[in-house]
Amino acid sequence: MKRFVLVLSALAVSISAFAQREYARELLEQDVTRSMNLHHNYEAPEKVVDTPAPKGYKPFYISHYGRHGSRYHWTANHIDRGLSIMDSLAAHDLLTEEGAAVRADLWQIKDAHKGVVGYLTHKGAEQHQGIAHRMYERCPKVFEQKDRQRVEAVSTAVQRCIQSMANFCLQLTRENPSLQFTMDAGERYAEYLSNSSGLKYVDKSRTNAILDSLITTELDPSRIMASWIKDEAAAEKYVHNPRIFIYYVFWAGSIGQCLDIEDPYIYRHFTFDEIYALWAYNDAYYYSSMCGNLENERNEDLIGQRILKDILEKADLALKEGSDKAADLRFGHDSALSPLISLLRIEGLEEAHSVAQAPDVWFGFRSMPMASNLQMIFYKNKKGDVLVKLLYNERETTIPAVQTCCGPYYKWSELREYFTSLL
């Protein structure tokens, strides 16, 4: 009987994983630009859905962390590692007409990066202006309190984060010119906004083996190599690992959707199955480094803890009698926001899974696209009781480990106790 139960349990897990894979394929078929996950442009909610707050409660304070918006590649190496191989193949007349077209697309991407590597694009600016606009429309009362007109914004020293902060605050100023802003950036703020120092050493050999196995199993390079290269034997001098070479080219080109040029659309050079395979590998890669998983033993939690400590400290000050603070805004990186989301065990991330399961449990294009964000909206009644609602990428969410008091609303005292237990 016990064995029968175990078999049924394993079967249920297998069916669930299959369903998730099929769902992922469906989402990618709808929009293949989702396939490079963290390069994907922010998808704002088509319609803002708000569960009404309990009677008598009004919003009065917002605590926020946002990833920078769409950007250029943060390092030229992300273009050059694939393009340099393409250039070598071209120099030795080894590229087919299709291969030459791929190379031309990468050169278009590279040319667009001149002088702006790592900077925010216009699309990234628009994303943060849009999020700020919807934040204001969603909670106008927060920003219209006569005794709470101060908005404090902080950013890491990285230019794209500073640009994101400026665009966000610019939009809030348009919404309400009477708001008073302070905007600060620097290494001092990166100490808690995006600090990976002090992480314990974790052997990555198992993770690397999983990733190698995943790309080997999922991606068949034969069609692409035959389509791009005239003489594969001669090309071996330059292409040492066909799968990784293909991934480098795909990664370099996928940033096109974020740029201020017409996207050359690298996806046209790949079949859907190839795109899916590259997505699965990329998804697992970032799950391995940005989320709590079995292989890294939740090592990234420390990054999230530093942000959470700041959230708690600033919330305590904002909740004090006489505070003039309407909002605390933070601007940083995916490598910090993702560990925070993982640390909190937000719905869908309650458990740590193996990196091998990443494509079944974590979709990077949904969880951590450009301009992804977490918002905590604080409400209180005339008695001074405080409730909090969480918005993840502007959509209501919950933390299953903590019981809500009604709908998505938490008693702040209980949520604060839970947050404190995570530090």
Residue ranges and their predicted role:
Residues 20-152, 156-328, 332-423:
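Signature for phosphate-centric chemistry
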